[in-house]
Swiss-Prot record:
Gene3D superfamilies: RNA polymerase, Rpb5, N-terminal domain, RPB5-like RNA polymerase subunit
Source organism (scientific name): Eremothecium gossypii (strain ATCC 10895 / CBS 109.51 / FGSC 9923 / NRRL Y-1056) (Yeast)
Lineage summary: Eukaryota, Fungi, Dikarya, Ascomycota, Saccharomycotina
Family, similarity comment: Belongs to the archaeal Rpo5/eukaryotic RPB5 RNA polymerase subunit family.
Cellular localisation: Nucleus
Entry protein name: DNA-directed RNA polymerases I, II, and III subunit RPABC1
Assembly description: Component of the RNA polymerase I (Pol I), RNA polymerase II (Pol II) and RNA polymerase III (Pol III) complexes consisting of at least 14, 12 and 17 subunits, respectively.
Record field: transmembrane: none
Length: 215
């Protein structure tokens, strides 16, 4: 395997691990073994005899954990797909959209290499009420939530959000905001109106929590 390909495979392996962590952090069932897959095992499982990655084989489905379903009983399954083609056009995206709809997935996560055409992006809303999220492979090589300067973010369930507003006698408009395109909001798949709890470390009080609403 040449050095460039070796580097690309290593980056793809790291992106794959981030995706598994991201799906698990959203409350879906992912085993620790899946997260800890070694580079050698990744090559054996997802590369051909020439050492080239076969992205189609990396697609996977995950269901919410029992604990997640207690808090969010309507949370459906997620389908994650890594795209083989460097650039994504209408045909490829249409196939992905059809798959999400036909299999009744609530969320589709589409991971691309270089770019998606504007026409292909226009297809995304057609799966409503399901949602499709797109991520560039490069953006997933490092898990941003593991950075020491990024505090812990936890998405609240609808019930937890109601309790929060009631406890502090707040209206939604009084909560600080987090933009939907914020990297951590994208990582957690936050939708408009959802609230995230942010836990920061404090030198004086140990830990403290703040809340932000996604807009």
């Amino acid at each position: 395997m040449d050095q460039d390909n070796e580097r690309n495979v290593s980056r793809l392996w790291r992106a794959f691990r981030t995706v598994k962590e991201m799906v698990r952090d959203r409350g879906y069932f992912i085993t620790q073994e899946e997260v800890d897959l070694s580079l050698e095992d990744f090559k054996a499982k997802y590369c051909d005899s020439m050492g080239r990655p076969q992205r189609k084989m990396m697609s996977f489905q995950s269901n919410p954990t029992e604990e997640t379903l207690k808090k969010s009983p309507n949370m459906g399954s997620v389908w994650v797909e890594f795209c083989d083609e460097p650039s994504v056009g209408i045909k490829t995206m249409k196939n992905f959209v059809i798959h999400i709809g036909e299999k009744n997935f609530q969320t589709g996560i589409f991971i691309y290499q270089n770019g998606i055409t504007p026409s292909a992006l226009k297809l995304l809303p057609s799966v409503a009420p399901a949602t499709i999220e797109t991520f560039n492979e490069t953006a997933l090589v490092v898990n941003i939530t593991h950075h020491e300067l990024v505090p812990k973010h936890i998405k609240l369930s609808d019930e937890e959000k109601k309790e929060l507003l009631k406890r502090y006698r707040l209206k939604e408009s009084q909560l600080p905001r987090i933009q939907r395109m914020d990297p951590v909001a994208l990582y957690l798949g936050l939708k408009r109106g959802e609230v995230v709890k942010i836990i920061r470390k404090s030198e004086t009080s140990g830990r403290y929590a703040s809340y932000r609403i996604c807009l």
